[in-house]
Amino acid sequence: MKVSEVLRQVRQVRIPKKGFPVEETIAKELLGSCDNRADVIKVDDSGFVSEEGALYIAVVPKGLRARLDHQGLAFSSQDDWVSINSDVNQCLWLLSSKPYFLYTGFTQLIENFLDEEVSDVLSWMQEIGFSVEKSTFDLFLTQYARLIRDFDREKYIREYARLGFTHIEVNALASSLPWEKGVPGEFYADFYTYCPALDQFASSRLNQGIYPAEYLESNLKLLKDNARLALKYGLVPGLLCFEPRSVPETLLEKYPTLRGARVDHPFRSFKPRYNLSIAHPVVQKHYQELLIKLMKEVPELGFMTIWSNDSGAGFEHTKSLYVGRNGGAFMIREWKDDEAIAKVAAANIIRFFVLLRDAGSRINPGFRIITRLESFYGERDHLWPQLEERVDVEVNSLLVKGWESIYPHPRYPDVKVVGSAYQNTLMDKERGAMNELNSRNSRSYFYHAFGCHTNHEPLLGIPFPWLTFEKLQAFAEQGVRTLAHVGGIHPPDKVPYAVNQEIFRLFQLNPSLDIEEAVQKMALRYAGRTNADDLVEGWRLVEQAIRAFIPLSIYSHYGVVWQRLFVRPLVPDIDRIPESERAYYESHMCTSIHNPNKVDLSKDVLFDLVTKDYAHMAFSRIDENVWAPLESAICHFKKKKDEAASIGDQKAALVFEDQYFRARALKCLYITLRNTAVWIYAVQEYQDAGDPSAGSTARKLLDKMMEKEIRNCRELIELWNESPIEWMIISGTEETPFIHAANFAELLEKKITLMENHRKDEPSLDPDYMFRLKNNPY
């Protein structure tokens, strides 16, 4: 008898009386999927008895596990598992060790086992690959791409549970813009749209009335709704906040002695922004009250991730504050050396973490605080020994201080990478540092990214299954059990063939999987037996191109959107374009009025993003190694799409069509990034030229680049108008500096016009652009 037949014959579904919402969720979904109107009954432990026609769905605590042992059910000796059993009475059991693995097991049942013989899945027991897979900085659910059009939050959260994730962040602003007030000409207030602080959801006795009640209520409502959905599917809800974040000056005017550190960026911000001094007991009580209020609303909150020293947040007297070490009056007196200040600053950081951990633990005893270490390079030596129980870190590497990159690009060993899919290995030495923290019950959540963020933002659904697998395998080989996936997953209704995250799901359910076999089976499911090999071949070509690409600083991370690369003109002298004609993109660009990035793509504020030599190396290697496999992939997908359509194989035609348009979009992205590298090199080379021939060569490079970029814009417009799939993140409401909107094609037309009008201008850079001053009296 097949599993589907047994399910239709189920007369009663039994779940624990004192259980989890996910058990009831699964019971209802399962009965609905097999058109069975059986009753769902809640029973206590004594009711878990094998009976014909019964189906048990449960998370198994130790007490219940002992009882089930007597039913003849076998369990893993490990802590993390899921099982599907049919016993001698044809009683079915869907069980897991943790609530967040139960839904994964359920989807395995309905997606893979329905047509199997019951005897073949008599006792399916699977140990889980990673104890924790935490979502961090989820673009779509909580962060700056939450405006994405037609977003189905429940379907998205359900997909997390299906994939085998365990923890997700749930705090997001309900409005498109934060409450933070800015100053004309600066770019700073917008940064408060992501990782919203505790005071965006609740008020304390200290800051009552600072934010409008309706603003806090709407944010809290969204947080609670996200948390409810997380719990519905068995996930642990938590928070990601920039803290201690700046507060409105009106609060500091009322309590001037509570002024803490200046935490803004003096180039990007046109007014000083200060937070509260967390060394003061009143401020500590304020933070405790905020967190406890939130947890009374959502007692199941399991963690709070704290990012800091950026985006209007920072810890007092830490070295990486943008204006340098500074803070309130209570930590250390003046004229102390750097080491003494670092020691006190580290103690203050840990005290804050422990304060919040203990506050959260009053309601949820397992509550954890998680932070990043990069920002604390000046305090790391003092901070590390103080990391303690349930004070965790999330990292790209435990071996470095600050933002150093020590991992080689998978194809180019001379290029160092950090954080993206290109960081596909893990050094043996990471294990020792991780084990040291584990011995204190302090976890290390290692970053990885198989979505668009840090890889191909704003594109959706770009496949690189082998790179994805290699990082997971590296984690497993080093004994890593806790992960943090950066950037969110692909929304399932927009990316029906989310190859990379499917690899994660398969690995989570089978850490010893064979990647070639896994990719082949996935292709078989998507395209059918006749076309599976061809689909794998297309993926292989796309990944070959991805591996051959060289990242370009923030442009390969988020800068295509933030710096508006897709829609800003790449011309020899950007400064020659009148400001009024540049406004269509500069008004939504992450930049202040005097940022040299407005006219020089190699710079951002005082950073040298991409040097001339690196830019030359990048576009040379891209031209040599990327285009052949990527063009082959595009042609391959188109050919197979047309062939499948011609014989009426709709299933295969759809997947080849989907991959064809995504590969074309990837080519457009890579061309713009490549052309950005050419611009950086050629404009500087022209200015540096000591003889006419060098200048002439640079000029020719620029001319060819502009031809390519104009053609690329037209290709993007064609993609926009013709593609039946959602290949790019697009806002459903307004354009912001972090997301494009429905006017994307119109902006590309404006770019083309400006490039055609200014392509003959002489290459030029003003090294003093940032010193320009309107109404300069001199």
Question: What function would you assign to each model-found segment?
Answer:
Residues K296, E339-Y778:
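Substrate-binding groove of N-acetylhexosamine-processing glycoside hydrolases
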Residues R8-R11, K18-F20, I26-E29, S76-H286, ...:
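Feature activates predominantly on carbohydrate-active enzymes
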Residues K285-L290, N424-D428:
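A Trp-anchored, charged/polar loop motif used as the substrate-binding/catalytic surface
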Residues A58, L92-S96, V393:
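Short hydrophobic-aromatic micro-motifs
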Residues K319, G324, G328-E334, A340-K343, ...:
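Structured, solvent-exposed acidic/aromatic patches
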Residues D45-G47, A174-S175, P244-R245, E374-F376, ...:
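Conserved beta-strand edge residues that scaffold enzyme active sites
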Residues M1-I84, E116-S123:
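Acidic, contiguous N-terminal accessory segments
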Residues V49-E51, N85-D87, I128-G129, E297-V298, ...:
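Extracellular/periplasmic catalytic domains that process cell-envelope and extracellular macromolecules
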